[in-house]
Amino acid sequence: MALPRPTSPHARGSNRTPAIMRLVLGACVPGLLTLTWLYGPGTLLNLAWASLVALACEAAMLALRKRPPGVFLKDGSALVTALLLAVALPPYAPWWLTLVATFFALVFGKHLYGGLGQNPFNPAMLGYVVALVSFPLEMTRWPSPDSALGLPDSLREFLGLATRPDAWAHATALDVLKTDRSLTVDELFAGNPAFGHLGSAGSEWVNLAFLLGGLFLLWRRLFTWHAPLGMLAGLFAMSLLFWNGSGSDSHGSPLFHLFSGATMLGAFFIVTDPVSGATSNRGRLVFGLGVGVLTYVIRAWGGYPDGMAFAVLLMNLAAPTIDYYTRPRTYGHRKAERGFKAGD
């Protein structure tokens, strides 16, 4: 009896790209619902619009590259990018801001380099940084959790029809801590509605929700613990090093930084990107540490309140070098070959 001899791989896993993307989308649901609960339906409007723009850009670029649109549109990667942008952008972002960020993420962050699996930078963070650098005023329109708008007002904000579009602008705790150095941190927490129990008001709950979703992905083994732990450890260590207990010039406590801004979103949904990050476990740990350290440096001394996106893009640049110096031991050799050799 002749036995079939199919080509390798003979052992097949269940983690195909569409299945992975569905898990990531599902893990973002707690954070998405928390954002909607605290800040109103603006985030859902961002998500719906970003998804339409992402799919349109994906289809157009696939057509230009003469690739079958049906196959690649179903993998869910464009929707994941749209979701990450939707939860990162302010809930009251105008429609054109979401369009610009999503367009740059899909076209310049993904397809310019060859599509899924070829991008050296995280597409969502690239689109976010383009929006932040180009339109800083619109990127600061975060409302207070106790003054969230309903659907009609959120829709007017989204369409740019509001009579006073800046009326609901609200400084986050990271903004206040960077600009108000006359008060101690304890005084800021006691007298400013931007601060919650651990970090920014509202942001601490959003971070807890994304932490829950990230732990679910970790439990499902979609990624290893190295990059998230490295990032959180780097951020924690830097904030602990410069924390003096009360002075506002210490830039906030370790817990404050862990539960403010986009910390947990970055730790579990951004730095774990298998394409733009490091590949070995040791490299992922170094990559995460670098993101955490750079995030704190930008938060404390940079020109932006939250430096997560910039930190990720800078470490994306360093990822090939990290991979080169953290190569695992090759089977049959006693130790890994590291560093550049003569003639390389």
Swiss-Prot record:
A GO CC annotation given for this chain: plasma membrane
Cell location: Cell inner membrane
Broad enzyme group: translocase
Domain of life according to the entry: Bacteria
Modified-residue entries (FMN phosphoryl threonine), positions: T172
EC identifiers of the protein: 7.-.-.-
GO biological process, one term: electron transport chain
Keywords: Cell inner membrane, Cell membrane, Electron transport, Flavoprotein, FMN, Membrane, Phosphoprotein, Translocase, Transmembrane, Transmembrane helix, Transport
Cofactor entry: FMN
TM region positions: 23-43, 44-64, 77-99, 120-140, 198-218, 222-242, 252-272, 285-305, 306-326
Membrane topology designation: Multi-pass membrane protein
Keyword Flavoprotein (UniProt): yes
Transmembrane recorded as keyword: yes
Main subcellular localisation: membrane
Pfam families: NQR2_RnfD_RnfE (PF03116)
Family annotation (HAMAP family): RsxD_RnfD
PANTHER family linked: ELECTRON TRANSPORT COMPLEX PROTEIN RNFD, ION-TRANSLOCATING OXIDOREDUCTASE COMPLEX SUBUNIT D
Entry's family note: Belongs to the NqrB/RnfD family.
Assembly and interaction partners: The complex is composed of six subunits: RnfA, RnfB, RnfC, RnfD, RnfE and RnfG.
Function: Part of a membrane-bound complex that couples electron transfer with translocation of ions across the membrane.
Record-given protein name: Ion-translocating oxidoreductase complex subunit D
Organism of this sequence: Pseudomonas aeruginosa (strain LESB58)
